């Protein structure tokens, strides 16, 4: 039963709305769709001199900075407000993501996988794909990547060897703009695996797919209260959905696995509409960076010793 171990809110009708005047309510109702369509239009019509990955990187930084500002203007929960201690910890992981993890992805991760696949397949085999309208290409790339992430994430909650590195991410006790980067490097590497790099031969479509990911998936880990339109809540993963996934209630964590497209959860029966304020594990115990780095290995070693130690202790028949 969801909510048996920790308080959660289930059902959109029970979730608080944005309070304030009509201007504030308008902004926090239509901000998400506006940013989605505005950035899509920008990258769709931008000249080739601007349609580059380097420009996209700076656009992403700017978008995250804007959301960081909104966290101070209209926080979802005061208990999630960013502190200096949380900020310093988060920036350590953000730096890790843009350095070591990016290098790992290039040499042994999704980028390497994409190059290996391209080595065995001729690009002319995909002329049917390149002939599709640009937005359709982008939507398909976006869906394929998120579909893979859904099953990787669900597998992490179902198989203990994968759960060990992922469990570190579930020790976070609040959501904010940088929390998506917090976790054990092994888990962050695995969750980033996909075939997105396989579509590098379609740079504009890949950029548009990245915009779709940026303007829908980023909201998983932010401390902002939105009055998201009903169609948005049906299609995309919201902070509400992901807070429920991060709650201290075990049954609630077995829901809402999709990174951006919550309707994938709806298809497979793992979607729960709701939210939670109390996040984390072990009653909200906060992990140090050192423990986050070593936890999967120390716990894995304990599990192995317990399993094989018990087997060797059994008397011979």
Residue ranges and their predicted role:
Residues 41-54:
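Short, hydrophobic transmembrane alpha-helix segments
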Residues 16-34:
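N-terminal membrane topogenic signal
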Residues 51-66, 85-90:
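Loop-to-helix transition at the N-terminal end of transmembrane alpha-helices
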Residues 31-44, 62-68:
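Hydrophobic core of alpha-helical transmembrane segments in multi-pass integral membrane proteins
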Residues 92-282:
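Membrane-embedded catalytic scaffold of the fatty acid hydroxylase/desaturase
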Residues 278-317:
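A membrane-cytosol interface segment of integral membrane proteins
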Residues 69-90:
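Transmembrane alpha-helical segments that serve as helix-helix packing and pore/cofactor-lining elements
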């Amino acid at each position: 039963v969801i909510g048996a171990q920790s308080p959660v809110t289930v059902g959109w009708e029970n979730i608080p709305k944005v309070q304030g005047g009509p201007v504030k309510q308008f902004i926090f109702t239509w901000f998400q769709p506006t940013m989605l369509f505005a950035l899509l239009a920008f990258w769709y019509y931008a000249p080739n001199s601007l349609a580059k990955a380097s420009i996209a990187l700076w656009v992403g930084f700017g978008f995250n900075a804007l959301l960081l500002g909104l966290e101070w203007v209209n926080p979802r929960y005061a208990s999630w407000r960013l502190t200096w201690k949380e900020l310093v910890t988060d920036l350590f992981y953000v730096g890790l993501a843009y350095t070591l993890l990016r290098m790992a992805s290039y040499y042994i991760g999704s980028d390497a996988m994409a190059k290996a696949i391209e080595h065995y397949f001729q690009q002319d085999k995909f002329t049917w794909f390149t002939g599709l309208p640009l937005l359709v290409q982008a939507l398909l790339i976006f869906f394929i990547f998120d579909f893979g992430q859904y099953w990787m994430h669900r597998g992490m909650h179902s198989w203990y060897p994968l759960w060990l590195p992922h469990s570190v991410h579930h020790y976070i006790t609040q959501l904010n703009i940088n929390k998506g980067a917090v976790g054990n490097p092994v888990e962050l590497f695995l969750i980033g695996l996909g075939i997105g790099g396989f579509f590098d031969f379609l740079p504009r479509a890949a950029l548009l797919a990245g915009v779709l990911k940026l303007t829908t998936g980023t909201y998983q880990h932010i401390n902002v209260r939105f009055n998201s339109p009903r169609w948005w809540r049906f299609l995309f993963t919201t902070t509400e959905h992901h807070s429920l996934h991060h709650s201290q209630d075990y049954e609630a964590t077995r829901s809402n696995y999709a990174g951006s497209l919550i309707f994938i959860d709806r298809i497979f029966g793992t979607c729960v509409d709701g939210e939670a304020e109390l996040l984390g594990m072990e009653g909200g115990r906060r992990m140090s960076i050192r423990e986050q780095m070593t936890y999967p290995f120390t716990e894995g070693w304990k599990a192995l010793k317990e399993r094989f130690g018990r087997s060797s202790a059994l008397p011979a028949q």
